[in-house]
Regions:
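Segments forming oxygen-rich coordination pockets for charged ligands
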Residues: 1-201
Length: 202
């Protein structure tokens, strides 16, 4: 639909923070919101900034902490600090978005590197890869800021959806499936008994 989106990602934290590094929130040009970066503390503020970025096309890095007057205004009172990256993606970035979607729904991993000085992006795919540094990142699935050639890059690891295999279509499984779906697991329910309440597991 040629919607433009802004992905807001936690790229660094200090002390107590509501969401870990790599947590993301997405805002599109229809004002839809998915995800969170602080559990409600700064979402309204970064939402407004995202709408500005959709218009301007510029990336932005914002920092919030209790010593920042702006942080009190938006409600970040947990005692720590967070830094977030706001990046615009449009239909011209469809190839990148399709790669992320394929990794999430299938298998494999990839890393998107963002140059924090200018917003430039590069993609590192997991196979084949001969770089020991990125191999460790893929193995640990740890997103973080790294320095390459005296430049700060945020390295975001994308991996497939976590899977939960449940053996037995019993009443406890029904509640477990609902909980797993809320937590965004890909659920596989296995039971060879065909008459065990298929209608309850849609």
């Amino acid at each position: 639909n040629k919607l433009e989106i802004v992905i807001i990602t936690v790229i660094d934290t200090w002390g107590s923070s509501p969401r870990p590094i790599g947590s993301s929130m997405i805002v599109n040009s229809r004002n839809d919101i998915v995800g969170s970066v602080s559990g409600g503390c700064i979402e309204n503020f970064v939402f407004a900034k995202s709408l500005d970025i959709i218009k301007s096309g510029k990336y932005n890095v914002l920092e919030f902490g209790v010593t920042n007057s702006q942080a009190w205004e938006v409600g970040l009172t947990c005692g720590g600090k967070i830094k977030v990256l706001l990046e615009k993606f449009s239909y011209t970035d469809l190839k990148t978005i399709k790669k992320i979607n394929k990794v999430f729904n299938d298998e494999g991993k990839l890393i998107i590197l963002t140059d924090l000085s200018n917003g430039k992006r590069e993609i590192i795919e997991s196979k084949p890869i001969n770089n020991n540094f990125f191999s460790k990142m893929f193995a640990n699935e740890t997103s973080k800021i790294n320095i390459f050639n005296n430049t700060n890059w945020f390295c975001k690891v994308f991996s497939s959806q976590y899977k939960l295999i449940i053996i037995g279509a019993v009443h406890i499984s029904e509640s477990l499936v609902k909980l797993a779906n809320i937590l965004n697991f890909k659920v596989f329910l296995i039971d060879p008994r065909n008459n065990f309440n298929k209608s309850n597991f849609k």
